[in-house]
Amino acid sequence: MSTDTMYFNSSRLLPSAGRNKTNNLIKQKTRNNRARGNAAKNANNNNYITDIPPPQTLPNGQKPNFGHSSNKKPSFNQKKHSPPSSPSSTTTLGKKNRQNNKETPRQNNKDDTRLLSQNLKNLLLNQKQSPHGSQGIIPMGCNGSAKKLSHSYAGSTFATNGPREAKNLPKPSFL
């Protein structure tokens, strides 16, 4: 007797349906029952009543602003980083500022930033247009004396520590 036939008729095995019979099909659980059960649980949890506190007011009668909301709506038509077209554009007041005729510190900072960036731009343009130009880097010699040696190579000017370094530089082919 083989081991297969030994356990085939054993009383320990539970009777089971054949492979192709419908008893083996898994019945799918309906989702409606689960959804209803969760809705009932949520309804039971939300039965208690909460007291809503009265709205806060400051001593001057205004509502507090904790930095999460602003009275201004952002304008998408203006570019953030566009430079002012004329000096009068920095002094032009917005619609709300015309009514209140006040400037907030943030607006003052924006104007200061524009003014500083315009001044820096003018300074850099004036340095490039000046006849003196940049004189190069002044390297310090071994004895502490400053020697100014600038060399031009392929359209760029750079400083070297001495004439020996300049001799080792490759010569451009067009010279």
Swiss-Prot record:
It comes from the Eukaryota. Residues 1-27, 58-77 have a biased composition (Polar residues). Residues 1-113, 155-175 are annotated as: Disordered. The modification N-acetylserine is found at S2. Residues 35-47 have a biased composition (Low complexity). Pfam families: PNRC. InterPro entries: PNRC-like_rgn. Residues 100-113 have a biased composition (Basic and acidic residues). One of its GO terms (molecular function) is mRNA binding. GO terms for biological process: deadenylation-dependent decapping of nuclear-transcribed mRNA; mRNA processing; nuclear-transcribed mRNA catabolic process, nonsense-mediated decay; positive regulation of translation in response to stress. GO terms for cellular component: cytoplasm; nucleus; RNA decapping complex. The modification Phosphoserine is found at S82. The keyword Acetylation applies. It is found in: Cytoplasm. Keywords: Acetylation, Cytoplasm, mRNA processing, Nonsense-mediated mRNA decay, Phosphoprotein, RNA-binding. mRNA-binding protein which stimulates mRNA decapping by DCP1 and DCP2. Involved in the regulation of expression of multiple genes involved in glycolysis and gluconeogenesis. Belongs to the EDC family. This is Enhancer of mRNA-decapping protein 1. It comes from Saccharomyces cerevisiae (strain ATCC 204508 / S288c). The lineage of its organism: Eukaryota, Fungi, Dikarya, Ascomycota, Saccharomycotina. The gene is EDC1.
